[in-house]
Amino acid sequence: KEYLAKKSVWIFGGDGWAYDIGFGGVDHVLAQNKDVNIFVFDTEVYSNTGGQASKASNIGQVAQFAAAGKEVKKKSLAEIAMSYGYIYVAQVAMGANPAQTIKAISEAEAYHGPSLIIGYAPCEMHSIKGGMTNCQAEMKKAVECGYWNMFRFNPAAEAGKKFILDSKAPAGGYQEFLMNEARYSRLTREFPERATVLFQRNEDAAKERYEHLLKLVDMYDGK
């Protein structure tokens, strides 16, 4: 055994696969409690098949099959995985915090069991102002305004360090962030009144999500 290197198994896929059409398989693999790692590139849309809405798409987002803006919030894949209690789970955004991304990957690799890392991944379907050259900056904005949260759940960590919330409290500018991407801003031109309602629901859901993550910090800290 001393001459055999440890196998490192990583599976990479998009949100359409992990959240939606391949979710049953992803869930089955994670539930087996084997030493396998899954990295999901979360673009919040079916990027490779024409831009259809997926269960990772967010409230008010315009996509195929959601031309008037998606009405319901996105699925919480991370928390579904966390509910097992023995899966390493992290959400990352490289443009916002490269060190946190590397740390999550390192921890997942070192963890003796299944792991799931979900990375925020801007894509052409988002139609970011200035184009994809701004995708790293867009990740940072997403985290700063509270649209995307970064955290790490490590079942093997000591008490008080099992759940680490790496995101700071939202700094504002949420609606401005949405308007910087045509996947949202186009709704204001086509259905302005509906856009106002859905975008506010999107922001409210983000606030609730952050408050929930704070409660998870307290819960795993034993407070």
Q: Where in the sequence are the language-model features?
A:
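Thiamine diphosphate
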Residues: 1-52, 89, 95-112, 186, 193-197, ...
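Conserved thiamine diphosphate
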Residues: 3-5, 57-111, 179-186, 192
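Structural signal for hydrophobic packing residues in well-ordered secondary-structure cores
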Residues: 30-34, 44, 82-88, 105, ...
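Glycine/aspartate-rich loop-and-adjacent alpha/beta segment that forms the canonical ThDP
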Residues: 101-197, 201, 211-215
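Short C-terminal domain-edge/linker segments immediately following a structured domain
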Residues: 41-45, 68-72, 121, 146-153, ...
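Acidic, Ser/Thr-rich peripheral helices and adjacent loops at domain boundaries
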Residues: 53-75, 133-153
